[in-house]
Amino acid sequence: MAESRTERKVTVILATDVVGYSVMMEENEEQTLKNLKVCRAIVEGLIKDHHGRIFNTAGDSVLAEFQSAVEAVICATEFQNTIKERNNSVGEEEQMEFRVGVNMGDAVSYTHLTLPTIYSV
């Protein structure tokens, strides 16, 4: 039988997603993907700078894990401020608005053979 392991730990999760992403993709897929690539680079850099680790992405969303709630909140605030500055310096077609949430709590991680660790908060 396949071996699996379950662990619990307190962790901090930062989640981001683009407001109106589906509509933006419908209206101008090429421009939306270009804008997302720029914004994704911003959030990835900030997550790294604040000692976080991206553990999942899907479309317009990013999930990152932090050991420190303070670092996660600072990262989220800097990301929102950087996106606001970017939006003020580009045309309307290049602007993106993000929702950002931070959650701290007991997480369950599952490891099954060679499959990646899956967190459930």
Annotated model-derived regions:
Residues 18, 107, 115:
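Hydrophobic pocket-lining residues within nucleotide cofactor-binding pockets
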Residues 94-109:
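A short glycine-enriched loop-to-beta-strand structural element that forms part of the catalytic core
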Residues 22-25, 87, 108:
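Short amphipathic alpha-helical interaction patches enriched in hydrophobic/aromatic residues
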Residues 2-78, 82:
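Catalytic NTP-binding/metal-coordinating core of nucleotidyl cyclase/transferase enzymes
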Residues 84-92:
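Active-site phosphate-binding and catalytic loops of NTP-dependent enzymes
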Residues 112-121:
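Single conserved hydrophobic/aromatic residue that forms the stacking wall/gate
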Residues 80, 92-95, 113:
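Cross-kingdom TIR/SEFIR domain
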